[in-house]
Every structure is written in C-alpha cells, then in structure tokens.
C-alpha cells in the first residue's frame, strides 16, 4: 500500500507532526509513504530553516518534487530520498470556457496580488501600450495605471472559466525589469500552480527567462520567456497571428491532460 502526504501541511505548525506520523506509517509492513511538494516554505516564506524542512522531507520513502532544478536543490541540501519530477500540476476544471473571438486584454495576471508578492503591477503603467486584466486579492486599485483593470477575485475552480486575455503572465517581485527578491529566487526552482491555471484556460504564457518553468514553455512552445515585461511588450506587438495560433494549438494538448487530471 502507498500513503500519500502533501507538503507543506496546512496549518504549517502541523508539518513536523505529520512527518512523525509518516515515520510510524512507514514502519508498517508493505506500506510506503510518498510526499508531494507544493511549496518549499524555507525559501518561499523563510519561516523555517532549510535543514529543518529537509528533515521533514526525509521522513518519507519517496518525494514528488517540481523539476530537475528543485531536485538538485533538495539533494544539495541533504535530501536522501528517491525524488520524482512532477513537471506540471493538474488543474481540474469542470465546464467549458466561453469562446472569446477577440480578448479585450493583452495580458492577464491572476493569483496573489499583494504588494509583497506582486508589487510590479503598480509599475505596469510604464508598459502603456498593453492592457492588463488582474484577478485575485490584495490589490490597491487606486494605485493602478489607466491601462490596468481589476476584474475581481474568483474561487480557483471557476477562475479558468472567467479569465480573459491573450497571454497569461507568471511574474513575481516588485520590478518589471526582472523577478527579484525571495519570490523571484523561488521561481528559479518552483513550478507555480499559476502556469497550470493559464494552460487550463487555453492561454499562452509569458514567463521569466531565468525561471524553472522557462524550459517547459520554450521546449513545448507554450508561450514566451523574457528577461523583462518590456521585452514581452515588444514581442507581443510584433508576433504574427499565425505564430500566436500555433502556440494556442500546442497548449490544447497540455490543456486536455491538465484539466482531466
């Protein structure tokens, strides 16, 4: 038998207790424990040491991590368990999105829009030739530029059916020039659920070229990877409709897998 656990456990203070429970379970005959990593809070939040988090992770027989870069990070910091790459998270969607002939917005940004995680949204007024649509919580609407519309917040299960835009942006930090700070560093090893959100909605993506997901996006031609949002602006303005449609066709293959689990 296999027992699957998730990491980090919510509430976080129970993660150590859960790791202890996994040790007890693993001692049962013919029972193996598997851990699915959603986030590494030692990097994302800095609310515990890397060594303590690795100790929790080492309590399981096998670990499902995001990608090769996260796998290397875990091994370099003392993870001794079998590591398996997930690559992309599922994003189960019930229902079909209404077909939009021509999206009113160039770029959609969904998720945690707090100033700590997404402070860059208040600099998007400098990218005045593009129109942005924001979905999520933590927005200070009065500080947004005239080219930015706040569309509200929706539950994760219906969000893919609500968002509209020609491109979905995966970006963190307070700069439009690059992803910086702890959240920016985390993108170098993390596969954000946001990527699966956009793909489940059939939207091509824009990602930072130093992020872990840039490899997937480039290899399977699911969007573009850029050094800055200004660079994205230039590409979007010059990409042909034929090339854009080719990317959309590539996404459909992944969408079918992601939304069905």
Regions found by a protein language model. Name each.
Residues 1-74:
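Extended catalytic core of nucleotide-activated donor transferases of GT-like folds
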Residues 163-201, 207-215:
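Nucleotide-sugar-dependent
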Residues 220-226:
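A short acidic/histidine/glycine-rich donor-binding loop in glycosyltransferase catalytic cores
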Residues 227-234, 240-261:
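A charged, aromatic-enriched C-terminal amphipathic alpha-helix characteristic of glycosyltransferases
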């Amino acid at each position: 038998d296999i027992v699957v656990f998730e990491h980090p456990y919510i509430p976080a203070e129970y993660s150590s207790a859960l790791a202890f429970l996994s040790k007890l379970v693993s001692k049962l005959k013919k029972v193996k424990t598997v851990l699915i990593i959603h986030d590494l809070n030692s990097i994302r939040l800095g609310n515990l040491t890397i060594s303590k988090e690795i100790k929790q992770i080492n309590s399981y027989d096998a670990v499902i991590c995001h990608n090769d870069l996260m796998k290397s990070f875990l091994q370099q910091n003392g993870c001794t368990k079998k590591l398996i790459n997930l690559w992309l998270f599922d994003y189960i969607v019930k229902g079909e999105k209404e077909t939009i002939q021509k999206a009113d917005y160039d770029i959609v940004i969904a998720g945690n829009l707090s100033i700590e995680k997404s402070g860059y949204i208040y600099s998007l007024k400098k990218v005045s030739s593009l129109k942005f649509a924001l979905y999520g919580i933590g927005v200070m609407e009065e500080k947004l530029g005239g080219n930015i519309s706040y569309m509200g917040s929706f539950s994760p299960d219906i969000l893919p059916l609500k968002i509209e835009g020609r491109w979905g942006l995966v970006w963190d930090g307070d700069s439009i020039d690059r992803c910086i700070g702890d959240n920016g560093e985390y993108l170098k090893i993390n596969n954000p659920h946001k990527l699966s959100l956009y793909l489940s909605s059939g939207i091509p993506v824009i990602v930072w070229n130093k992020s872990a997901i840039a490899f997937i996006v480039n290899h399977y031609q699911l969007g573009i990877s850029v050094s800055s949002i200004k660079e994205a602006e230039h590409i979007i303005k010059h990409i042909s409709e034929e090339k854009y449609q080719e990317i959309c066709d590539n996404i459909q293959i992944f969408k079918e897998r992601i939304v069905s689990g």
